[in-house]
């Protein structure tokens, strides 16, 4: 079944114009770009994710290779489209899907529901530390019922638990979007069953090798808490399994350092809201492109005439 949010391009004109201002892109180019997104050959999938692709392309901006949602710039229509996509996924019958298609489905649902949850409860927060919480003590963002699947109300915690228990793949953790900058990044394209495992492998390598995620100091492997949150579910609670996983995904320099690792330590997680500030980016770009002020020409001071009859004794 093919579906289209036919008004998506028109109702997100404000976001498109912001993108054009910051990237010096004309509206015509944006329309052409949107048509290109729609014309991409759809990978075979029992669920049509083309609207998901278009939506995520329109509401996210790639910042340093990491897609971030422009929460502050989304209008009510954009929020509605996010909700419509959540409703569409919630209405799907997934009982006959194979394992990879089910995995892709739950990852896509988790990602878009997280975006919706942040829009509802967290977009005005600089930090999601309290709202997100931890694996042991999840906050409201994770525990509040967000979507109904098959007549059952589900929270992000419920969706996460399903992903971790139903699919025997440690790379699943790299598809669980946390809404924070210290977690795995949001995808600008939907997961598809035929490519989901390869995509998660790419996510794993990107995350493990990201700055500050995994470091080795004095034979201690310092990790972001995300790995320790999921150690039991993804790595059997075994430090050796986790270390082997990190080595498999590390680049040569990090991999060499990991061989010196003898123990693990948890670092702090960057709970900053994972969003792109369109206005700030525009201001920074404008400042960078502003021509330097010309120095004022130096003038030689002219001698002032002495007043007649002047002097201290007059």
Residue ranges and their predicted role:
Residues 6, 132, 260, 308-312:
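Feature targets compositionally biased, intrinsically disordered low-complexity regions
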